[in-house]
Regions:
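Conserved beta-propeller blade repeats
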Residues: 1-18, 43-63, 88-111, 134, ...
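Beta-propeller blade-edge and WD-like acidic-aromatic loop motif
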Residues: 18-38, 47-48, 54-57, 61-86, ...
């Protein structure tokens, strides 16, 4: 599946799903009707699908043998062909991770040419669309996601020797805060911006946060623990459901799990 996680959900009814053996494609899955509609048809493996804020397009990356890595988008109503936003053929991997709330900036995980680690890049969605690095160092920085109010960036860095979740101001970086304590990856903001989720091992963690004039974070708490064969997930618009991906076995199709009802102690701990 796909999105700021691979279960990106523009509303509570339709999510993007990546499926296929060999070349993969992006499909739209209706939670209400339990139906799949194919969105992409070109050759190559697709990664990182994201809905644009207006719900009219899906952004994704595609890896092909002839054209390398490209970041693209496609209308979801079938009214037009896919369009290349950024050609990054010199990089072995590009993965869109987040769009700013106004849809003007796209964050992309870019694997360096030597394959040593990821850097976080930004692609303006208007004008000449010249991508530039946002977080780039000898360490790996990835999984960048912008907060719902557009003021903060959550991401993962391995600068301490293990992957940890951090938050900095955005788009001008500064005021960095470490969020995870014992490892973390794949951060995701709640739609309200009052919680920050991340994963560590088989646990989904949640942290109460304040994101208005200043950023403040509470103590991470384990929301639940379960084994999921795929790491990607997303938070529903109502903030009360998580969409997870769980493989049944190697020969059967993947199914979606909707996790309901946060623990009562977490509800009481919210600011």
């Amino acid at each position: 599946m796909g999105g700021g996680s691979d279960g990106d959900c523009i509303d509570n009814h339709v999510v993007t799903v990546i499926a296929g053996s060999g070349d993969s494609d992006i499909w739209l899955y209706s939670l209400q009707r339990n139906t799949l509609t194919r969105l992409t048809t070109e050759q190559g493996n697709k990664m990182g699908p994201l809905w644009t804020p207006d719900g009219k397009r899906v952004v994704y990356s595609a890896a092909t043998r002839s054209h390398g890595m490209n970041v693209m988008w496609i209308p979801v109503d079938g009214g037009g062909a896919q369009q290349v936003l950024w050609s990054g053929s010199e990089s072995p991997m590009l993965i869109p991770t987040s769009l700013s709330p106004d849809g003007k900036l796209l964050l992309i995980d870019r694997l360096d040419a030597g394959g040593r680690g990821f850097d976080e890049w930004v692609l303006p969605m208007a004008g000449e669309r010249q991508a530039h690095p946002l977080l780039q160092s000898e360490f790996s920085e990835q999984w960048g996601v912008v907060s719902p109010n557009g003021f903060w960036l959550a991401y993962v860095s391995d600068e301490t020797g293990s992957s940890e979740v951090y938050v900095q101001s955005f788009p001008e970086l500064g005021n960095r805060v470490q969020i995870s304590e014992l490892g973390g990856f794949e951060p995701a903001w709640s739609r309200s911006g009052h919680e920050l989720f991340y994963r560590t091992g088989d646990k989904v963690m949640v942290v109460p946060v304040e994101t208005e004039k200043h950023f403040r974070a509470g103590t991470p708490q384990a929301l639940f623990e379960d084994h999921y064969d795929y790491s990607d997930y997303d938070i529903a618009l109502d903030g009360a459901h998580l969409l997870m991906i769980k493989g049944q076995n190697e020969s059967s199709p993947t199914h979606l799990n909707v996790v309901l009802n946060w623990p009562e102690e977490w509800k009481r701990a919210r600011p």
